[in-house]
Amino acid sequence: MSEHIVFLTGKLAERNLRREIEALGPEAFTHDVVRLPISVAGLMTADFIGRHFSPDGTGARIDRVIVPGRCRGDLGALGLALGLAIERGPDELRDLPVHFGRKRKGADLSAQDVLIFAEIVDAPMLSVQDIVLRAQAYRRDGADVIDLGCLPETAFGHLAEAVQALRALDLRVSVDSLEPADLRTAGRAGADYVLSLKPDAIGLADEIGSTPVLIPSEPSDTDSLYRAIGQMQRRGRPFLADPILEPIQFGFTRSLARYQDLRERHPEVPILMGTGNVTELTDADTSGTSAVLLGVAVELRLNAILTTAVSPHCRRCVREADWARRMMHAARESQSLPRDFTDALLTVHARRPFPYSSDEISQIAAEVRDPNFRIQVGAAGIHVFNRDGLSVATDPYQLFSRLDVEQDGAHAFYLGIELARAQIAWQLGKRYSQDEELDWGVAYERPAEDKLTHRAPGPTLVARRRRARRT
């Protein structure tokens, strides 16, 4: 027996909801669409549903009830009261196929097998307290190991203290220096890893308990790296090997090939790739760059990456690497392309930016019977409508004369913010939802919302209500 689902909706969304359900195909499930006495479905709450929805009214067995994604309130308590399984659907009706698993892979993104080393490149210039604060921020972003970068000809007198402070917080620590004295200090202070040992410094590994990262004498001298690998294997000591990723136009492609060659020749050797030479030295948004580099790392089954966040455009590199390693791991394990797992790395453009065509928005607008402005974005531009009509423009200034809000400062302020968001969404090809911030993926951490509580009225709505009481 197929599952029977009841969809709750409002007046304006009913037609589009029915169309989307039918597009899923008759074999998916049986269903009823119940329109509650509300125009905008997204404004219904759990309390409202409890007052206006009766399961007996459908006259059929109900396996679950799906309410609009923006519905607020305690659906668990509502489900207990009604004796039904109740869940939120997607925010946009066009995403129903995704909700029902038609396109999303539904993989477990908690799985990954690439360690992230996050380097604090100016550690000698920071106090121990500031190093700890930076390290904690990197850990929140997904770093597994905090790398303390040493600077040439710069004293790091508090290196041991910094290592011990991080270890006391249960953080794994690496120290990055070409000076043997720094690496000895790091090892004796309890550092988990030391970067980087060239072949002529292999003997240092015998003096400390830290796991070394091996690099070639010169990036192009892979034979020296293989000799170092052999020496460490004969010692029976753990290590990582790094053939060194070079900047684009300065040996990048050849250096990628060295990682592939190392993996093929030594499938048993743990490998680290430093990504900063590409992310830091390329003027391109790092979400895409990080995705490609982690794609290479996961495909070659590399074991770790070292990333930096020095340049302002690299400020999210640690978080991007964390999302990228999880997405790429899920794609590899499911033997599929890295698509439809997460939108976290789609920071500038959306895969499906405009859920409705201009004709569909016009049909929605024709159903509106109140003066409140609705805003939607389609391929043709910004669509603004209420009971008095629909206007479409690509520049918010073109809409000003049609809005008639010169005497209502609070409402004009609100519409200005929403139209600015809508214009950005149209220009970049992003998803726009009225009263919601634009989704910038991993580039900006949006405050978490508690859908069990009702959203407090915004200051512009409070001002309009206050003004209405005075008139």
What are these regions (language model features)?
Residues 2-109, 342-471:
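Long, compositionally biased, glycine/small-hydrophobic-enriched stretches that function as flexible linkers
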Residues 6-10, 15-16, 20-28, 208-349:
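Catalytic alpha/beta core domains of metabolic enzymes, predominantly
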Residues 43-46, 70-77, 96-98, 103, ...:
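Active-site-adjacent beta->alpha loops and helix N-cap segments on the catalytic face
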Residues 45, 126-138, 179, 183-184, ...:
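Short, acidic/polar
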Residues 65, 138, 142, 176, ...:
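Conserved, mostly hydrophobic/aromatic
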Residues 81-83, 111-116, 153-185, 207-214, ...:
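Alpha-helix-loop-beta-strand connector modules within alpha/beta enzyme cores
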Residues 86-91, 146-152, 170-179, 183, ...:
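Catalytic beta/alpha-barrel core
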Residues 112-133, 217-221, 278-287:
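Active-site mouth loops of central-metabolism enzymes
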